Amino acid sequence: DSLRKVKSDKADAVKIARYALDKWQNLKQYSLMDELRNQLKTMNRQFGFYMKQKTAMKNNLIGILDQTYPGVNTYFDSPARSDGSQKWVDFASTYWHVDCVRKMSLSAFTDHYQKWCKRKKYNFSKSKAEEIYGKAKELVPVLPKDEITKRIIRQAVDQLNSASSTVEELRTLMNDTASKFPEYPIVMEMNGVGPSLGPQLMAEIGDVTRFTHKGAITAFAGVDPGVNESGTYSQKSVPTSKRGSADLRKTLFLVMDVLIKTMPQDDPVYQFLNKKRAQGKPYYVYMTAGANKFLRIYYGRVKEYLSSLPQSE
């Protein structure tokens, strides 16, 4: 309780001892599950870090390709494979310059593209090959088709593939780790949650049983409405607190985005989002309100499910 700001081993020991004495009745034994939760949270933070790296590498590659093969990144929209590879990236690695396509005849390119799809195990479409060839005839590159340009692009492709591979490895490892948690089955049943967002949610929320009520978990996420009262004054519309975990709020917004895109008509959170949007509420208002409702449902379902399990688990 000193006014001085002291940082030493002795002062730290006193703080830890005081905390233990104050919280003695509430402290629980550290378990293997706590270690798994800490590992999952660390993996999630690494996942976020490498996702930023992947985005930066992707933008870097697109910027270079705009000088050799503009728009090639828009030809395919298939998601990344389990090894991190993407069709448009592999295509750009092979056909790194517009002259790689238009210097061939249409039949020669179609045949070459078909063999490439077979070798890379991608679906082949003759109409797609004709579309690519037709667009290539209209493009004007800036950089020449030589070994220097080729090396620049191949280096950018390798960097993106490396980051993408790490992201997919972490995604798989996080799902495998989260599957060991008792709440995994009930969380994965919720709309808007899948093998990627589910583990991220469990990583950031942690052990639900440590929250005493629904308001505690929404406050932890920072999606609870703020309070501004003094005497007889009471502000009606107060922004959310945003005092909690920013990473959890980001994950919740991604879940809300999935709900809006998939539109599950029988889902209460989606119905709530639709209602708020119909009322003309701003984007951040209805997204935050939806996240609040989702967390309350998450808390109730997980708490009920855990209480139904045998005590040994």
Give the residues covered by each predicted segment.
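A detector of single, family-specific signature residues
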Residues: 1-313
